[in-house]
Structure formats: structure tokens, C-alpha cells
Amino acid sequence: MTGSHRQNGHREVLYIIACGSPLARDVGRLVELAQQDGWDVCVVTTPDGAKFVDRTAVARQTGHPVRTHYKNPGDPDVLPPADAMIVCPATVNTVNKWAAGITDTLALGLLVEAQGRGVPLVAVPYTNAAMATHPALQAGLARLTEWGVHVLFGDDVVPLHPPGTGERHQHTFPWARTLATLRPGCKEGPLVNASGSKGAPS
């Protein structure tokens, strides 16, 4: 283990929230790295994220069921409370809704509540160059950053690509860097916007 994610002898719990992107097929790689860092990992998907994630394989890997939908009234919680959350891959849809406080999916409800509880949050958008320039996304990322969410985004994370070519760039995705933001003493830089400049988008 390279991390020290333990409290009172128990492993701290990390939620990995996977959104609807082909990159979500590889979420098991992030799970493995997080487990090596000492986390007890749970995976939550958005409804579209569930289309890409092998739920059976991930449940076997984590020891927890993969959740997508709100539970029914009276049903018990099947996941332990989160000590930190990583949204990876984060889609434009989820970022925009999150920044607006919308909670129409389990993933968004968990994120909005976690922000109010002061849970450390990391967002790693994965999108194409055209969508990355949309004013709503730029404003949403700036708002999340202002609220204390650690956003990793831009050409120094994953080079932004033309529409329809995302799967060709998945092999370059820096899974380890994504997780490193939660390590004690991490000095990751500020958000990088779609143009590649430092600081929150304007």
C-alpha cells in the first residue's frame, strides 16, 4: 500500500462514480490502484455509466454491489458511508447538473450531499474538444472548483480530442494521477481549462 487511508483500524471508504463514457469500461483499473492505496472502494454509476461498467466483475473486485439507482423506502443501505469520492469519468451532463445542484440520479444525490458534509471530492471530466468549450461546462467546472472540488481537466491531464475519437485516447488516461489527488500532502495544481491555461475558466 502506498497510502495511509485508515481510521481507527478500519480502511477509509472511497466512492468511485462512473458516468456514461466508454472510459468507464476501465474503471476497474482505478479500483485496483485505490485498493493498493489502502481504500475500501465502492463503485456507483450514473444510469448511462451502467451501460459501460461490468457490474458483476466490479462487484467481485470491490466486495460491494455496484449501485445506480436510489433505494426504495425502507431498504437498507448496502454501501458504507464515503470518506472521499472521485467522479471518473465525469461527463458534461453530470458536471452541469452537479454544478446546478440537481439530484435526479443517485450519483448526483450522493455528490450534492457529500459537498454539504465536507467530504473530499475529485472530478475528472473526459470529453471531446468541442464539448469542452461549451460555456455551461466551463462555468460548471469553475463553480465546482470554487466550492472546493478538486478538478483535473485539460490537455495536461488528457489531451482534448475531436468528437468521435475518445476511445482512441483512452490508453493515455492517467488513472494513477487521478487517485494521487487524495493522497496526504498532494500538491496537484489548479484546474486547467480547455485552452490549456492554468486557473479556473473564465
Question: For each of these PLM feature ranges, what is it?
Answer:
Residues 1-202:
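A cross-family phosphate/adenosyl-ligand binding-site feature
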